[in-house]
């Protein structure tokens, strides 16, 4: 077992922390969010009765906050032993992590504000539990296992990946024939991407930026880099708050989609001359670079809503700056030689989870994403022989199962196909 200590042990060693009150506060947050997560409530009842995960060890690298914690405890209730750490150095809520670590079937190593060495030490600590299932947000754990612990690959049943960036990495790994066990691309299934990516990212990113800066969007030029599902959500929600939205893209069909939906579309260097607020959502690096910083207006706000901190090139911005200082909690101002100040939120990390006041996506949205995670883990265990190594789409019946639970919880009834309609859809002989 790793020498890196679970969070409870780390807090016990800190004489300035009241561990019990910290756990109590974390538990309070978890209970509040669970009230607004009917899918997880229903799955808790099912998993508690059938114990579909009995005997399994689940290793997780996720954003450790209240909503994630409810997924963790659902998995533990289903019979699994769970070890978890963060997937971003700034997204952990220590009180929630402490509450999780007090669960006898859960070990949490997640701690906010760790340096790079401690971040990877915590991942190693989770891997030391020898997981049979992995759940990742960004693919750092899958990478660590393949790179440093190939001896574990034969005993891992499979995994699930939460986010766009992680799925991109996994598909690249799969194309190189390096991925050695099956992983569900949770990000790509409709119950995740149509809600979490669009509404979750759009609402939480903009809400966090507004609360961090105490500024309005009305009348401002908001530049959205990338028009995938996340970028589309940011653009829609910004327009709904009376911002003038400009979209930048490298993919012609997405650019055309943004244009046909009424947004201005232009290259980043042109948008940089007009933007007041910049939000990157691409999952790629060097989206905003020196040539863009050089033409931005004084006071521009720069935020990243992609997984890693590489979309805004902070090395180049630092080289341009003659001074840096904390303008507000979570806002780093870079003063340039001509007196302009460019303001970067949350160190260029995932703003809706890494900013000091960030709470992540709304509970109702994450309820759907984490419901998919839970049924994917169950599917891997119950039908492990059906999945070869590689990236797999979430089976449609699992996506529908979660949708049906949500509709029932919302009190929404829908029609069902008649036998005649089903036969018609399955037939190829009916023409004009």
From Swiss-Prot:
EC identifiers of the protein: 3.13.2.1
Region (Disordered): 1-24
GO cellular component: cytosol
GO terms of molecular function: adenosylhomocysteinase activity
Binding positions for substrate per the UniProt entry: 137, 162, 192, 196
Cofactor: how and how many bound: Binds 1 NAD(+) per subunit.
UniProt name for this protein: Adenosylhomocysteinase
């Amino acid at each position: 077992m790793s020498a890196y200590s679970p969070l409870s042990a780390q807090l016990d060693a800190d004489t300035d922390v009241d561990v019990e009150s910290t756990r109590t506060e974390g538990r309070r947050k978890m209970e509040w969010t669970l009230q607004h997560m009917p899918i997880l409530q229903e799955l808790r009842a099912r998993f508690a009765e059938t114990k579909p995960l009995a005997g399994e060890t689940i290793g997780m690298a996720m954003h450790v906050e209240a909503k994630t914690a409810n997924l963790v405890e659902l998995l533990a209730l289903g019979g699994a032993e769970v070890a978890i750490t963060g997937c971003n150095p700034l997204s952990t809520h220590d009180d929630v992590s402490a509450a999780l670590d007090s669960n006898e079937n859960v070990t949490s190593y997640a701690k906010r504000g760790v340096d790079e060495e401690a971040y990877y030490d915590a991942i190693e600590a989770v891997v030391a539990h020898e997981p049979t299932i992995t759940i990742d947000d960004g693919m750092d754990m899958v990478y660590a296992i393949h790179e440093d612990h190939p001896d574990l690959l034969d005993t891992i049943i499979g995994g699930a990946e939460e986010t766009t960036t992680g799925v991109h990495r996994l598909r690249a790994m799969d194309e190189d024939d390096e991925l050695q066990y099956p992983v569900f691309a949770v990000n790509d299934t409709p119950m995740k991407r149509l809600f979490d990516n669009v509404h979750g990212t759009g609402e939480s990113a903009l809400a966090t930026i507004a609360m961090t800066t105490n500024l309005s969007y009305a009348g401002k030029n908001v530049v959205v880099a990338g028009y995938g599902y996340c970028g589309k959500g940011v653009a829609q929600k910004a327009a709904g708050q009376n911002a003038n939205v400009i979209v930048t893209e490298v993919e012609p069909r997405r650019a055309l989609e943004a244009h046909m939906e009424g947004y201005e579309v232009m290259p980043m260097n042109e948008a940089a001359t007009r933007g007041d607020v910049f939000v990157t959502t691409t999952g790629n690096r060097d989206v905003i670079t020196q040539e863009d910083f050089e033409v931005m207006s004084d006071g521009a706000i720069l935020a990243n809503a992609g997984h890693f901190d590489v979309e805004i090139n902070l090395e180049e911005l630092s080289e341009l700056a003659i001074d840096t200082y904390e303008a507000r909690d979570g806002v780093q101002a870079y003063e340039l030689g001509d007196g302009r100040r460019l303001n970067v939120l949350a160190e260029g990390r995932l703003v809706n989870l890494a900013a000091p006041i960030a709470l992540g996506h709304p509970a109702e949205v994450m309820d759907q994403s984490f419901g998919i995670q839970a049924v994917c883990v169950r599917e891997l265990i119950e039908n492990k022989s059906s999945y070869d190594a590689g990236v797999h789409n979430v089976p449609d019946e699992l996506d529908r199962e979660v949708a049906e639970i949500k509709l029932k919880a919302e009190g929404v009834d829908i029609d069902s196909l008649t036998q005649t309609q089903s036969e018609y859809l399955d037939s190829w002989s009916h023409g004009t």
